[in-house]
């Protein structure tokens, strides 16, 4: 696929001189160079915060985490509230707002939806660059009057989700939500800008069975796995049932009933 032929080297750059110090700090923290003429991606620091820009003539626009405006705001205001499928999948009901661990946080979109509906969220992201975007987006959102209270319900952890779940200390999450990167083979899956940018960097979650196993061992009430609608279930324990939408479905693995 042409979209993946670009090099996967990454450099950090400031979009204006006043962001140079921040860019250098991120470069040091992420272990990335400030100059790399062969890089296929740039981590850019500017007025809109941190963003990742794929380089090259046909590259899509930059990817950043923005919980205040754009898609996240539209979904928060008009997405269907507690009636939307993800809410039903994790067990949101009258008087029930479960504690949820999103073990494959990505850019935090699903976690933000659940937090906006009142769930206490813990997020794990294993890819340091995506985790950095998420951290930056959460930090900017905390200063916003409308969404500041929502993101206060979102706690970000970094590292390997399987290892973190196996070594979990303290109260277990009631619900664990998984959305592993599925190995797509058709170009339609790469239409979304985020997919085009991150698939070469992140790859597919080939350890999905181990991820599910660790989640089932830790969750106190249920595990929910989001999959493309026609994708096979993850190898291992079979889900009890699924909720199916137009393009995706939620496989549900219950352990015990959620109560208010």
UniProtKB/Swiss-Prot annotation:
<dbReference type="InterPro" id="IPR029063">
    <property type="entry name" value="SAM-dependent_MTases_sf"/>
</dbReference>
<feature type="binding site">
    <location>
        <position position="179"/>
    </location>
    <ligand>
        <name>S-adenosyl-L-methionine</name>
    </ligand>
</feature>
<dbReference type="InterPro" id="IPR007536">
    <property type="entry name" value="16SrRNA_methylTrfase_J"/>
</dbReference>
<dbReference type="GO" id="GO:0008990">
    <property type="term" value="F:rRNA (guanine-N2-)-methyltransferase activity"/>
</dbReference>
<comment type="similarity">
    <text>Belongs to the methyltransferase superfamily. RsmJ family.</text>
</comment>
<keyword id="KW-0963">Cytoplasm</keyword>
<dbReference type="GO" id="GO:0005737">
    <property type="term" value="C:cytoplasm"/>
</dbReference>
<feature type="binding site">
    <location>
        <begin position="125"/>
        <end position="126"/>
    </location>
    <ligand>
        <name>S-adenosyl-L-methionine</name>
    </ligand>
</feature>
<keyword id="KW-0808">Transferase</keyword>
<comment type="function">
    <text>Specifically methylates the guanosine in position 1516 of 16S rRNA.</text>
</comment>
<dbReference type="Pfam" id="PF04445">
    <property type="entry name" value="SAM_MT"/>
</dbReference>
<keyword id="KW-0698">rRNA processing</keyword>
<keyword id="KW-0489">Methyltransferase</keyword>
<protein>
    <recommendedName>
        <fullName>Ribosomal RNA small subunit methyltransferase J</fullName>
        <ecNumber>2.1.1.242</ecNumber>
    </recommendedName>
</protein>
<keyword id="KW-0949">S-adenosyl-L-methionine</keyword>
């Amino acid at each position: 696929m042409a979209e993946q032929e670009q090099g996967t080297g990454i450099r950090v750059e400031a979009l204006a001189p006043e962001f140079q110090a921040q860019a250098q700090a991120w470069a040091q923290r992420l272990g990335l160079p400030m100059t790399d003429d062969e890089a296929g991606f740039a981590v850019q620091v500017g007025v809109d915060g941190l963003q990742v820009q794929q380089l090259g003539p046909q590259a899509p626009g930059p990817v950043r985490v923005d919980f205040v405006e754009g898609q996240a705001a539209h979904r928060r205001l008009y997405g269907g509230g507690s009636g939307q499928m993800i809410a039903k999948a994790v067990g949101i009901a009258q008087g029930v707002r479960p504690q949820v661990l999103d073990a494959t946080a990505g850019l935090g979109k699903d976690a933000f939806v659940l937090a906006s509906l009142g769930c206490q969220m813990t997020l794990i992201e294993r890819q340091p660059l995506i985790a950095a975007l998420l951290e930056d987006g959460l930090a900017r959102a905390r200063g916003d009057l409308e969404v500041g209270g929502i993101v206060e319900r979102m706690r970000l952890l970094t590292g390997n989700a399987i290892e973190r779940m196996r070594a979990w200390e303290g109260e277990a999450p009631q619900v664990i939500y998984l959305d592993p990167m599925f190995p797509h083979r058709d170009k339609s899956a790469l239409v979304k800008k985020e997919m085009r940018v991150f698939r070469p960097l992140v790859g597919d979650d080939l350890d999905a069975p181990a991820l599910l196993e660790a989640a089932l061992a830790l969750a106190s009430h249920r595990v929910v796995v989001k999959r493309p609608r026609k994708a096979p279930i993850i190898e291992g324990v079979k889900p009890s049932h699924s909720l199916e939408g137009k393009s995706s479905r939620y496989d549900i693995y219950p352990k015990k009933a959620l109560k208010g």
